[in-house]
Amino acid sequence: MNKTLSLLLTTTALVSTPLMADTNKQEMVNQIQAQVSSWIDIQVTPQSSIIQKMVFNCEFYSATPYIKSPDGSESSSGSYRFYAHNGVLGSMTEPFTTQPLPELTMCLKEDFVVTNQDEAQLLFEAIETVYPNHSMFDENFPKEIIEKTNGWHFIDGEIFDDKKGYVVESTPEGKVTKIIRSLNL
């Protein structure tokens, strides 16, 4: 009987020790996650302007995560853009290369058309409020608006001797069907 009790206690001790160690590890992981999470701050800024209200039927936001180090310093790894359309929140495409910007096209007011230079200028300026060009290389670059057979080119800078900007495709009536960020205009 003593041997059985001794064997039972030994087996219980051997089986429960790793479980307690795993529980302690998970508790430490949870504590570390909670501490690091307390270092993160997210600043959300509404991006609103009169020109946006004239062109788009969405609200735009910028979210910037900041990491506060234990020594008190802060760092950020960039901002992210969001839109709200009919009560639905979505994230904006971040154009790092030539690519369509479907959220901008979707957010255009239903009756907005581009049929002349002034309306093209209005759209170009509205796009720049959503996607500001912060490149120091383009600060003094003269912006251009060029009418094409199926839309417009909005040029806002250069990259390796190629012009960059936006391609706006539209119907003959001026209804915008697609907005593309382009690095080779």
For the regions a language model picked out, list residue spans one by one.
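A short, surface-exposed interaction/processing loop segment used at functional sites
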Residues: 78-110, 162-185
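Exposed beta-strand-loop-beta-strand "reactive/processing" segments of non-cytosolic proteins
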Residues: 34-86, 139-169
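Short, non-transmembrane alpha-helical segments in secretory-pathway proteins
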Residues: 22-57, 67, 93-146
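Hydrophobic helical h-region of N-terminal Sec-dependent signal peptides
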Residues: 9-14
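N-terminal signal peptide c-region/cleavage motif recognized by signal peptidases
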Residues: 16-18
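Sec-dependent signal peptide recognition
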Residues: 2-8
